[in-house]
């Protein structure tokens, strides 16, 4: 096929016998026909991978099990589970798999099992949002289990259910914007210990269920949500530290080069092998790397091939080094398994951050994975199973106070009760602005109870009726009420500069009793922040009377609260 020529080719699969347990792709390549000064004959000038057929569902991991998991032993806060060829412990204080041993080999050292993780060492393109991640404490999340239950199932498995709150003790800040002035000192996060986080500060709540099978396989199924659904995260998933000897990394997914949601189609779905740290591209400024999308399975083994089923450094170690030579000696293999990782976008020199489908808002995510023992040469066979563990009930309350329960099961009824009251079968969203303790379980399995506590909703959702001035596009007035601190309202400046005063009419969607006003300033700079303010209320949107509050806000990024002298109806 010559330059600028077009032809239709038909690929005939008629004589090819497909294995229904495998998925198939076809790779198309355009090769250089003759040697050129810039490349040899056969050089791949273009290639594409096209899907042909999907694999049939693999058998359930539970189907091949024999025997039963022994009754676990409880020693203090640890639940110890052991069987033929495996030992593992779970921590009732954190809701985590605390340690894991297969065949006498330590796979997870005590305290380094899977923990919720939403942080990454910022890339150059993350400058559209990275300043927020330390403020939210994503680098320093601490897990606290608020509910626990265990159950030996009829099919011989052990089920451990946890509700876990993950929150930092305080937020932090850094001087990353000054990196060109003193690059040796600006990459550290400085925690603000003077402002400890409270129950209303950013946190995750996870309902998670571990299932241990008789052969030592352990499955995690979780539902993860946060109390700030509009916040933009770099990732959401689990991280664990494994012994550094487990440094042979194999995976079936896109590769071999790092890829992200918005930069992945050039890397094909194949089985890839290599050493941890040598499969990635180290940049002059160490930063997040090694991500692979569309991964079906991954395996880590040592030189002998013994294993469990991946970077030499943690995200904080990568972030803290100005240059590669300043990275510390590796002490572990850091494995991340993520429900979603934010794309890179192009904000360092292009159109902005990732597009909406490639962002990771702090809303709800279902995620699960299965850990199994493997040996060299058996990886593919061990991975040909599907999860079978119980999946948790999701409890979500929206900004209007409506509480909903969702599950991945179409025909399983959910039963709930509030503040220890009468159990009720869930039929429709429940008004729940006053908050309280909620317990929920499947009607056919009362042994696994998910528990979550919601605080009383004090704020009144607002909509905008009128705005005297706004910069259309990214800085419109809709951002004043979108509950997203990364966006902001700015008065017009592109066509003309609007003069003071500026005003906005808000609608509370009915008469409400109000006792104050909360204002979140622009987070990434002073332009557009409010200095002097006056607050008026009205019953009809026409007659406003005298201001019920007025004053001056400080020029900073901290949330401001104005308490009225007495509650008012508006």
Predicted regions and their residues:
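Intrinsically disordered, low-complexity Pro/Gly/Ser/Thr-rich segments with frequent PxxP/GP/PP motifs
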Residues: 1-21, 30
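Disordered, acidic Ser/Thr/Pro-rich linker "stalks" and the adjacent N-terminal cap
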Residues: 453-510, 522-529, 543, 549-555, ...
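Noncatalytic modules at the cell exterior or secretory-pathway interfaces
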Residues: 566-570
